[in-house]
Amino acid sequence: MPTVNQLIRKPRVTPVKRNKVPALQSNPQKRGVCTRVYTTTPKKPNSALRKVAKVRLTSGFEVIGYIPGEGHNLQEHSVVMIRGGRVKDLPGVRYHIIRGLLDTQGVKNRKQRRSKYGAKRPK
């Protein structure tokens, strides 16, 4: 533990917090247009074809967004809303596309956690 004199000479420095979602510019969501919709493979222990889209945001950033859920209707020039939230096994994917909003349809036949996937309540 430093002495009072040592603290006067060299005060404590708080580490700088790095922004994990810079493209959102402190907004909860941002709108963008899909420039490319494709699949990619996850990191080492996992194996799948994960659906992702390259999105040009209204702020001018070009980011990669993950498309959650089973099946989607996105293609080039689709208008989407993006939120923060990385995908742990996909390097470079730090955003999620919001389902059931703008051009993105909700997940069909979804019974649980429907609000997360933009699915209406089944009759």
Curated annotation (Swiss-Prot):
Keywords: Methylation, Ribonucleoprotein, Ribosomal protein, RNA-binding, rRNA-binding, tRNA-binding. GO terms for biological process: translation. GO terms for molecular function: rRNA binding; structural constituent of ribosome; tRNA binding. The keyword tRNA-binding applies. The modification 3-methylthioaspartic acid is found at D89. Signal peptide: none annotated. It holds the Pfam family Ribosom_S12_S23. It comes from the Bacteria. Gene3D superfamilies: Nucleic acid-binding proteins. One of its GO terms (cellular component) is small ribosomal subunit. PANTHER family: 30S RIBOSOMAL PROTEIN S12 FAMILY MEMBER. Belongs to the universal ribosomal protein uS12 family. With S4 and S5 plays an important role in translational accuracy. Interacts with and stabilizes bases of the 16S rRNA that are involved in tRNA selection in the A site and with the mRNA backbone. Located at the interface of the 30S and 50S subunits, it traverses the body of the 30S subunit contacting proteins on the other side and probably holding the rRNA structure together. The combined cluster of proteins S8, S12 and S17 appears to hold together the shoulder and platform of the 30S subunit. Part of the 30S ribosomal subunit. Contacts proteins S8 and S17. May interact with IF1 in the 30S initiation complex. NCBIfam families: rpsL_bact. This is Small ribosomal subunit protein uS12. The lineage of its organism: Bacteria, Pseudomonadati, Pseudomonadota, Alphaproteobacteria, Hyphomicrobiales.
